[in-house]
């Protein structure tokens, strides 16, 4: 399937499920099950309940999707608390 056929929607994470999956409530009121995309998993971008996310979905299965972007939330600017590795 070509990337041009994907639907991109905005939503909010409302539940954390096992195996790296999330329950996402979309802006249009539908609820889907989504997983994190490869780049988000590679760079260990964490998502929690209440985060605004951008989800890609195929038109063939409108109950599943892939989280491709997590909206940045303020409060992590200069002088913030840093965690050591």
From Swiss-Prot:
GO CC annotations on file: cytosol
> Where is this chain's protein located in or outside the cell?
Cytoplasm
Pfam families listed in its UniProt record: eIF-1a (PF01176)
Record-level Gene Ontology MF annotations: ribosome binding; rRNA binding; translation initiation factor activity
Record-annotated S1-like domain positions: 1-72
For the keyword Nucleotidyltransferase, the answer is: no
Annotated keywords: Cytoplasm, Initiation factor, Protein biosynthesis, RNA-binding, rRNA-binding
Q: Which InterPro entries match?
A: NA-bd_OB-fold, RNA-binding_domain_S1_IF1, TIF_IF1
Question: Major place of localization?
Answer: cytoplasm
Question: Can you tell me which residues the record assigns to a coiled coil?
Answer: none
Q: In terms of domain of life, where is this protein from?
A: Bacteria
Answer yes or no on keyword Protein biosynthesis: yes
UniProt record similarity statement: Belongs to the IF-1 family.
User: What this chain does, per the record?
Assistant: One of the essential components for the initiation of protein synthesis. Stabilizes the binding of IF-2 and IF-3 on the 30S subunit to which N-formylmethionyl-tRNA(fMet) subsequently binds. Helps modulate mRNA selection, yielding the 30S pre-initiation complex (PIC). Upon addition of the 50S ribosomal subunit IF-1, IF-2 and IF-3 are released leaving the mature 70S translation initiation complex.
State the oligomer form and interacting partners. Answer: Component of the 30S ribosomal translation pre-initiation complex which assembles on the 30S ribosome in the order IF-2 and IF-3, IF-1 and N-formylmethionyl-tRNA(fMet); mRNA recruitment can occur at any time during PIC assembly.
Q: What protein am I looking at?
A: Translation initiation factor IF-1 2
Q: Which gene name belongs to this protein? A: infA2
